[in-house]
Amino acid sequence: MLKGFTVPKSPFGQAALTPPPPWHYSSDVVGVEFWTDPDAAAATLPRGLLPDPKSNGHAVMMFLDWQFTAQDDEYLDPARYQYREALILVDAMYLDVPVMWCPYIYVDNDAALACGWTRGFPKKIGRIFQTRSFAASGPAAAPVAKHACNR
């Protein structure tokens, strides 16, 4: 009998894209709040959700640098358990409750893709990069801030 939490199944279950839960996560995150055309935001909503009339197209874009683990084996295969993710959240209403709906998520790791699919997230494979700086200054280290605040 073939085994595994996700596909591909194998005799010992080791070929699966992701191990079974529970999964534990840690990340760095950058979020950008923005307002878009309310009709464009409404076009992403599935049946059962309505636009939030108070939000006027409010949305959030998040960029995450994740590490996750299931059976404490991330140190054996760090590439399997580290990934980047970018997602969009738009304001909506479910019945009379304000919620945020996630129409798009991009990840750069197939294990993260499979974990998301098992929980109903609309993940797709993509490439996600963030500008970063380094402690050692130089032309390749992007400045964190160009100018100090003058008071």
Question: Model regions: which residues?
Answer:
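Hydrophobic, proline/glycine-rich low-complexity stretches
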Residues: M1-D72, R80-Q82
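A generic structural signal for solvent-exposed, polar alpha-helical segments
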Residues: P11, T18, V29, L89, ...
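Surface-exposed beta-strand edges and their flanking turn/coil or helix-capping segments
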Residues: L45-R47, E74-L76, A114-G120
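Extended, compositionally biased
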Residues: H58-W101, I105-V107
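Internal, well-folded beta-alpha domain core
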Residues: V97-R151
